[in-house]
Amino acid sequence: MQYVRLGASSLKVSRLSLGAMGFGDKSWRSWVLDLEGSRAIFRRALEHGINLIDTCDYYSSGRSEEIVGALIKDVPRSEIVVATKAGNPMGKGPNARGYSRKHLFEAVNASLRRLGTEYIDIYQTHIWQPETNLAEMMDALDDLVRTGKVLYLGITDMPFWQFATAYFHAERRGRAQFVSVQNHYNLLWREDERELLPFCRAQGIGLIPYSPIARGFLCGRSRGTERADTDDFTYKLYGRESDEAVTAAVASVAKKRGASPAQVALAWTLCQPGITSPILGATRIEHLDEAVAALSLTLTLEERHELEGFYVPRPARF
């Protein structure tokens, strides 16, 4: 396994990360793994040298964090980088979500209890709330860093102009700054290449993209799996005619290289400038093994052009 700095920080993370959305309670999503199933995936990730695990308070209504907390007890805390997120609805009250100082302080304390740890390595905003007071959010996040409950800050899926506003607010006031962005990025979704990716490269912010194989669309696993059959959101993201052309190009390159489509798709993400550690949401050991093997696959410039040539821009999400 290769280890790289997360953006301009001194924190070293593995070149691939383990996503824990699939760890939790089947009453939340039928395809998630229980504690023992999650343990098998986690142990294999450790064997591969993966040291960054990403979860969220919202996943399985907190159960994912509880499972991650149980799993990290098996290894020295210093060897694991734990990332989690806040901002999602965690109750019925009007302040049980979002990025007010009140909710952020309550959310971090609840996450620490579920994780069973004294600190969170990377604390990230998650589902964006347009009414957020950015100055209040950044000042509250800075206070969490100063208390020692949080070591580093990150964001997930925020409109670029608001991200830049928050970033420069923190810079002007000498506050703790974002070191990472978790964004939706793969061969079928490249919208962030216009603004977010260049900005992050210029400012020294690490990129830990999710869905590097587009929920299975890029490797022919988009149908017939339990998640695909129960997750309608996948088909709102992917499935355009141009997506089929990209998928065919992935299959063509994979055949010529003697690799799997998943490995080609992941190798493409890994070779993009500024990408630090794509997140693997594996719930099967063989898929995790397959993904790790992509680290040894280097695409030629001609292959990259072949993969990128069919992309059609998408409407803005925000």
Locate each region found by the language model.
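Short, acidic/polar
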Residues: 32-45, 99-115, 163-167
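Active-site mouth loops of central-metabolism enzymes
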Residues: 23-36, 90-102, 126-132
